[in-house]
Amino acid sequence: DDLLANRVGTVIGAFGNTLSQLLFGTNDVSTDVTFWCATTNQPEYVQAYVDDPRITQKLDPSKPIAFLTHGWTDNVNRTWVKQTVADYVRLIGGNICAVDWSPLALVEYNLAARNTPKVGRYLGKFVQFLLTKGFSINQVTLVGHSMGAHISGIAGAYLGGQVPSVIGLDPAGPAFTKPIPVSTDRRLDRTDGRFVQAIHTDKNIIGTTMNLGHQDYYANSGASPQPGCEFPLVNNDTTKAYLQFICSHFKAVEYFRASLDRQNIFEGTACSSYYSYKRNDCSAGTKDDFGLFNK
C-alpha cells in the first residue's frame, strides 16, 4: 500500500490534477483540505470543520488532540494513516484528526510543494477555532510525514510557535531543503513549536540531511535502506534502489507508530556523526527518546 511503485493510478491522477490546477486554479481551501477525526469513544472517522457547530460532540476538549498530515500523493484513507490513527486512539486516547489535503497533494511534485503553505495555514486556522471551543494549546500535537511535516511546521508557525510538540516524519527534502533551503516560513524548523522533533529515514533521496528541529533522529544513520527495506530478491539494481528508498521513507511512519506504545523505547544519542556513533565516540553522550514520550 505504501510503495509508490504500486500506485500507477496515482501517477495518472496526479497528471490530470496538475493540468486542471494549472488551467483552472484550485478550489477554495476549505474544499481541498478536510479534517477526519477519531476519539477513544468514536474510533471511526468523523469529518469536522472550521466553525463546526457540533465540534464539541465530535471531539472532547478536555483531552489532548493530535493532527496527522500525509505527504505527496497520499490521503487519509491510506493504510498507514488509518493504522496510525487507530494506534493513537488505542494507546494514547483522546482525540486525533487526520488532515486530508489530497486534492492539492495529488499533483506534480513541485506544484504540491507550492500548495503546502496554504494547507498549513488552514490547519492552523482549524486549531485556532478549536481553541475557542475549550481546547488548550498545551494539549496540541502536530505530526506530519514528508511534505506533511512541513505543513505541520507551517501550522505551528501560524499558531505563534506555541504548540508543545511538532514531529516531522522523514521531512521532504526536494523543494524544501534542497537544492537550497527555502525560507523557514515555508518549511519545518525549530521555531514552529516549543519542542520540534524530526526523524530521518531516507535522508539522501526523498528526505533531507538538514537538521530541522530541537532534536533530529537519524534512525540507522537516517539513510536507505532501513531494516526490512533491503529487497534482496529483486535483481534489477534500479528497481531495487527505488523500492528501498520508498520503503525507507515510510519507515519513519512505522517508527512513530511503534513509539506510541510505551514499551517500545526509541532512544537516540547526541553525536557529531553516525560514524562517531558507531565508534562509540559521542562526547556529549546525551540520550533522549523519540516521540510523544520524550523526556
Predicted region positions:
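Flexible, membrane-associating and regulatory peripheral segments of lipid-active enzymes
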Residues: D1-A98, L104-N115, G124-I137, G161-S165, ...
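Short beta-strand/loop motif that positions the catalytic acidic residue
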Residues: L68, V196-I199
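Glycine-rich nucleophile elbow surrounding the catalytic serine of serine-hydrolase chemistry
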Residues: H70, V143-I154
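Alpha/beta-hydrolase fold nucleophile elbow
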Residues: G134-S146
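Active-site nucleophile loop of the alpha/beta-hydrolase fold
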Residues: I167-F176, H200-N204, G222
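Flexible "cap/lid" loop of the alpha/beta hydrolase fold
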Residues: A175-D189
